[in-house]
Structure formats: C-alpha cells, structure tokens
C-alpha cells in the first residue's frame, strides 16, 4: 500500500484489510504490517506528545495483547483496547508484538483471535490511513528587504519543521500468513513467523491454542 505522491495532510486513503478463507480447511491467521516513511521518522513530536505521521484507522475489533511493552506502545498508534487472553477477544485482531528496525521502519504483528472456517472471513484489521493533519504546508516566518524599486523581496523563509513529510514516501506492507488450524501446524508456522523470543512466543501461541480448544496431541503429551 503506497499512497499517491500528492497525498496531503489530513487526507484519508481507504484501505480495508481482512483475510478470507478460500480453501477447504479451517485456518488460523496472522498478519505482519510494516510501516515506513522513506527519509523520515514514523512519529513526530506534537505539543501534547508523540503522534504518528501516518494515522491508521484500525477496524472496530482490534486490540493489543496486555503484555509488557506492547499495550503502552500501541496506544499512540490508536490501539487503546487491550486483552489479557485470546479467550477475551472474540472476532478480534490482537497486536502481539512491535519491532522498531534500524532502517526506521516498524513491524506490527497481529494474530486473529479465532479460527476462520471454509469461506469465512476475518473482521477488518484496518480501514484507512490518514496523513497527520499536523503536517502543515507553508512558511512559519519570513524576512523581507527593500529591493530598490519601491518594493520588497523575500530573502529568508523558515519552513514548518514538519513540511519534509510532504516530500517523503509512506509505504505500508501487509503480509498475511494462514495455516491449517491444527496444534502442530500453528506451533510451527506461528512460531517462525512471529519472530518473538521463545518465552513470549510460548505465552502467545499457547494462549491462542487454549482459547480455541486445541489441546496438545496425546503423542506429544506422553513425551
């Protein structure tokens, strides 16, 4: 997802994201969203705190996992609802992890709380993206000098410190991953895709499996 180059402050671009099961088996779903401003930071410092230069309008059923570091980081990006368990998150996309990358991009990891049946579809993860209206065009101060012809010339102008975003390119990359809804498949695929520490991964995946009634196979229980 890449808005047009003439994207302006306060302008909203529609982008509805959901995942449909077009296969013939039940599936579990996770999504990785990568945001980046080419040449600029994702966040800007406003008078009342940190804000995102691109404001994502999330779907109605989006929450953050109430884990250390996740819920606090999710609030400034507009995800204020939190859940302690997938069992408390019916038909909900749950933000499980946030990673800040060296190139200035940011990765957001979401797991859909339920199992998507054949021909079923998740709720909307997001609906649109708006360029923060605080990014204003124009000049904040000007200096003029007489030009010798009875008029004046503009000799110095200080641009708004946020103007540079208008010349930067925002990109959102969305990678959805689906897996057959079995204990082993979810453990393997989600374990690799979530890119979490082993301890955090165990908490998230085990909670998801328990919330969806997926018990460890008897053969594994015996090990």
Where are these regions (language model features)?
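Surface-exposed, hydrophilic segments of mature proteins
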Residues: 1-223
């Amino acid at each position: 997802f890449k808005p047009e180059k003439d994207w302006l402050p306060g302008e909203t671009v529609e982008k509805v994201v959901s995942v449909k099961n077009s296969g013939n088996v039940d599936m579990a779903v996770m999504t990785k969203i990568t945001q980046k401003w080419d040449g600029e930071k994702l966040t800007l410092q406003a008078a009342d705190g940190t804000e995102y230069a691109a404001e994502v309008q999330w779907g109605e059923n989006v929450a953050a996992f109430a884990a250390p570091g996740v819920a606090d980081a999710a609030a400034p990006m507009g995800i204020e609802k939190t859940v302690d368990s997938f069992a408390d998150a019916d038909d909900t996309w749950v933000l499980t992890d946030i990673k800040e990358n060296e190139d200035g991009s940011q990765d957001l990891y979401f797991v859909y709380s339920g199992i998507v049946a054949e021909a079923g579809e998740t709720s909307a993860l997001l609906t649109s993206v708006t360029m923060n209206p605080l990014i204003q065009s124009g000049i904040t101060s000007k200096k003029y000098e007489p030009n010798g012809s009875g008029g004046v010339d503009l000799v110095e102008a200080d641009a708004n410190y946020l103007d540079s975003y208008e010349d930067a390119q925002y990109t959102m990359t969305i990678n959805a991953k689906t897996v057959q809804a079995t204990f082993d498949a979810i453990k393997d695929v989600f374990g690799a895709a979530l890119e979490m520490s082993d301890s955090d991964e165990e908490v998230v995946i085990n909670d998801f499996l328990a919330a969806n009634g997926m018990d460890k196979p008897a053969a594994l229980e015996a090990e």
